[in-house]
């Protein structure tokens, strides 16, 4: 059996089409959703990511502004910019790109962002809302994974989902979203004994640990849905990336699998755009 491949690019394009229609409808009512992207320093990957986010927002008809601050920016200067954006009625979403230069406290910055403008979904208020099942802004990558599952007719209800990784950005919110959809969820991490045995019990296996091709065929139950969130450089290849899953071996066992690139990655920016529209609606009562 060879697994079906989940096309994240196609689903992301569908999400962006929906967002573009929503933006056009809001603009017809006199409201243009606005996204502010803040980049501190000159990390090459961060410069690419922020440029993509700003460009995508503009392509979908939003108001988008990129603030590129020097690496010498102080915590207070960054805080002042965030507070200024909190007060700006033309900005509905604020994203501060990580990682920040050494000496700057990302957690403190996140806490300063107005929770209604926290389109990354990282503010403690949004984290709490997610875990108690209240409406709020949800982290983009886990939200994108749920959209992929829906697009391919995978209902988590009654299924055993295993999430490998416990980060605040992916692992924990992923578990919360699966719980909301009535899956039985196990979270694995670096201290989990018998990882392969636990993973083999999964109907839905989400790998979000940041280790190159760590998940192999021995970790996967035949017919399982395997979602690979990892983005890892391949040693010896300047521009090649691979996921946390050994795609070639796992594809022979799984029922559905996401590739890297072209799986979860495109969904992250698409869901950021959806969050920005949602934030604009929340702030204006529409």
Curated annotation (Swiss-Prot):
Belongs to the tetrahydrofolate dehydrogenase/cyclohydrolase family. Catalyzes the oxidation of 5,10-methylenetetrahydrofolate to 5,10-methenyltetrahydrofolate and then the hydrolysis of 5,10-methenyltetrahydrofolate to 10-formyltetrahydrofolate. Its EC number is 1.5.1.5, 3.5.4.9. GO terms for molecular function: methenyltetrahydrofolate cyclohydrolase activity; methylenetetrahydrofolate dehydrogenase (NADP+) activity. Keywords: Amino-acid biosynthesis, Histidine biosynthesis, Hydrolase, Methionine biosynthesis, Multifunctional enzyme, NADP, One-carbon metabolism, Oxidoreductase, Purine biosynthesis. The keyword Cytoplasm does not apply. This is Bifunctional protein FolD. GO terms for cellular component: cytosol. Pfam families: THF_DHG_CYH (PF00763), THF_DHG_CYH_C (PF02882). NADP(+) binds at residues 165-167, 190, 231. Homodimer. GO terms for biological process: L-histidine biosynthetic process; methionine biosynthetic process; purine nucleotide biosynthetic process; tetrahydrofolate interconversion. Pathway: One-carbon metabolism; tetrahydrofolate interconversion. The keyword Signal does not apply. PROSITE patterns: THF_DHG_CYH_2. It comes from Symbiobacterium thermophilum (strain DSM 24528 / JCM 14929 / IAM 14863 / T). CDD domains: NAD_bind_m-THF_DH_Cyclohyd (cd01080).
